[in-house]
Amino acid sequence: MADTIKTAKAIRESGRENLRKVSISRIKKEMNDVFYLSDDLVITTLSAQNNTTAEYPASIDGFSAIIMMTGEATVSIDMQNYNVKPNTIVFFNPDSIIRTVKCSANAAPYFLAFSKSFVNEIQIDLSTSLPVYMRFGKAPVLEVAPQDVDEIRQLFQLIKTMLRSDKERYRHEIIRTLFTTAFYIITEINQREQ
């Protein structure tokens, strides 16, 4: 019995050694085509070639999401596999264990990561945000209509434009407002799906 417990503990600990903790700061340093707001918000595009979770699982220290534009992938979130295809949004809670199990060569999702402090700065009604947070903890994959993806993609493009903008005085407020808009669109989609 004692040997069985030691073996199980050794297996868990060896898995943790291979788990990479990824900060938003690290993402903005290591990815190509990155747009960011300090260490609070990062938007980038991913590809099969720069898939960093294929070899080892990772855990991101903030909230994150991908919107699959083309291609397909199988993603493991906390040891549960999900098929991701175009017009799919996948949400990752902080410290979720993420691994890409399989990925087509043409897979191209948008990736967004944002810190807990960034979320706390956004003025969203708790009665609106809590059901969404709870839903994505249980069912992180949301299939959406192409029009929904296009609206969210346009908002992300606008956020990226503002991240490059010379309008520094109100940049944070503008980006928070656009992010809040994206959140409410996703909330609307989520309520429609229930």
In which residue ranges do the predicted regions lie?
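A hydrophobic/aromatic-rich effector-binding and dimerization subdomain
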Residues: D3-A10, V101-R164
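Short acidic-glycine-tyrosine-enriched beta hairpin
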Residues: M79-F91
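Conserved hydrophobic/aromatic beta-strand scaffold that supports enzyme active sites
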Residues: T45, A65, I89-F91, F111-A113, ...
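Generic protein-terminus/edge-of-domain signal
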Residues: M1-A73, Q80-Y82
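Tight coil/turn sites that cap or link beta-strands
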Residues: N51, P86-N87, D95
